[in-house]
Regions:
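A short glycine-rich, Lys/Arg-flanked "PGG" loop and its adjoining helix->strand segment in the class I
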Residues: 44-48, 114-129
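Conserved class I S-adenosyl-L-methionine
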Residues: 129-158
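A short acidic, Gly/Pro-enriched loop at the edge of an enzyme's catalytic core
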Residues: 23-26, 86-101
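Conserved alpha-helix/loop element of class I SAM-dependent methyltransferases that forms part
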Residues: 7-27, 38, 42
Length: 186
């Protein structure tokens, strides 16, 4: 029976965050943080005590799980944000305060509406970045159905249409693609 890769063997969040440019003293948010804090907890370590990290999710149970893990690990620079990035103004983080936002395994949400991208624009600082990571289509897996996978070129097109430019497209792991965008300045 084949093994199912997990943790860093599937998606190394530390490597991806650093690739996106996350460094000491930055402010970062993960939109759709999920139950494990797979991106926010490594981000807390990368940005250090002078930085701020926001775990954003609409599911309170997911946020409670992340908060419990953060408390066990004595993380002090993590903010739990119950919010809806699919609604304009739905994320209660100060406008223009974030250096980097990530959307991990939520590309299907991005394809339904431009609101998440506009919400990211509202919250990003000038020259802010967005990291988008999702499942590659056409790679057989029992983890995620093929119908739930989104092509990276479709996401690329959406972000460009909303004032971002692509900095990098890359393989984010054995079953994931990654895109890094920068908010274009007028």
């Amino acid at each position: 029976m084949p093994t199912i890769p997990s943790g860093r063997s599937l998606l190394d969040s530390d490597v991806l965050l650093r690739r996106a440019g996350l460094t000491i003293d930055m402010h970062y948010a993960d939109f759709g943080a999920g139950m494990l804090g797979h991106f926010v907890l490594p981000a807390c370590e990368i940005v250090g005590p002078g930085g701020e990290v926001y775990a954003v999710d609409i599911l309170k149970e997911a946020l409670q799980s992340v908060e419990s893990r953060a408390q066990m690990e004595n993380v002090t620079n993590l903010h739990i944000v119950w919010g809806d990035f699919e609604r304009s103004g739905g994320v209660k983080i100060p406008a223009g305060s974030l250096h980097i936002i990530s959307f991990v395994n939520v590309a299907r949400v991005l394809m339904k509406s431009s609101v998440p991208i506009e919400e990211a624009k509202r919250l990003l600082r000038e020259n802010g970045r967005v990291l988008v990571v999702d499942w590659k289509p056409g790679i057989g897996s029992i983890i995620v159905d093929e119908q739930r996978r989104v092509r990276s070129d479709a996401v690329h097109k959406l972000f460009v249409e909303h004032g971002f430019h692509l900095l990098e497209a890359f393989d984010a792991g054995p079953q994931h693609w990654g895109l890094i965008f920068k908010l274009s300045t007028a």
